[in-house]
Amino acid sequence: MQIISQFAPLPLAQPEKGTAVAMGFFDGIHIGHRAVIESAVQWAKEHDAAPAVFTFKLPMVNKMKGKRLLSTADKHALIASLGVEYYLTPDFEEIKGLTPEQFVLGIVRDCNARALVCGENFTFGAKAAGNPELLRTLCAPLGVEVIVVPMAQFEEKPVSSTRIRTALEGGDIPAANAMLGMPYAIRFEVQHGAGLGHTLGVPTINQLYPEGFQLPRSCIYITRTHIGGVWYPSATGLGSRPTVNDDATKVTCETFIPGFSGDLYGTDPVVEFHAYLSPSKKFDTLDELRACINNAAKRAQEYFA
């Protein structure tokens, strides 16, 4: 997949074939986003065109779209896995002032678009003035087909990244995973911690959520961790470590991987979240903390048995 980081003509290998372009922010690549992208890929396959995605970049911390569910690298990998060949992702500042007409003409011109695909809640142009109905009106005289994909549903309500964030905040991992269409996962660098887990005989990997990422509820989760091509059952504690830390504002993510030993510092293993296990709490003794970690690990092994 070729990534183009500005609103500019795509370097199409066969310009005469044109493209089918999926449009949206696609922040979580949830089941609704995937339906839009897969529709563009399918149209391109049926009409001998190149499948493309048009989206835009926001600063890591922003108030416009909420906290991030995916890193940029993971987002690119997921979209590429769906069969997309071209990925156009200018900065939002570059396109925010375009009228709906300018926006559509720019995409049709730069992508040599034969079809534009969007969700039924898609907006475009300055102040989000455009909608799918206007998109059809603008594309008709250009001979460009418009495909509007119905919003995906979960529990009889539309799937959205906002709903996924809310599910994560509540610790409802099954709901978040159902809407994502895959396990919620993190892939952050393993950093040195205080070494308490090693002292207790339950060494953990420590990962910090970068600023701007959505945090799940602080508690203990059943997870699995991908290391060296192998998935290991694991237990992950997310929170302020109340037993040993008086600073309730410092959130850490610690994962115990029973049966694994090795140096993971500086690597970025994938940790998938599968189920809520128990609330985060302060223990009276370190022995109680050790017992809790071992019990969580046992539950994780049973879960994946």
Residues covered by each model-derived region:
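N-terminal Rossmann-like or analogous alpha/beta NTP/dinucleotide-binding catalytic cores
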Residues: 60-142
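N-terminal catalytic cores of NTP/NDP-binding nucleotidyl/phosphoryl-transfer enzymes
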Residues: 11-66, 71
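A short acidic, often aromatic-flanked loop/helix-cap motif at beta-alpha or helix-coil junctions
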Residues: 9-13, 94-97, 153-157
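Residue-level signal for inorganic ion chemistry
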Residues: 30, 79, 116, 176, ...
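Short acidic-hydrophobic, aromatic-tinged amphipathic segments that line or gate anion-handling sites
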Residues: 2-11, 88-89
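Phosphate/ribose-recognition catalytic cores of enzymes acting on nucleotide-derived substrates
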Residues: 193-305
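Short beta-strands and strand-loop turn motifs
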Residues: 22-24, 54-55, 87-91, 115-120, ...
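Glycine-rich, Lys/Arg-enriched anion-binding loops that position phosphate/diphosphate groups
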Residues: 139-239
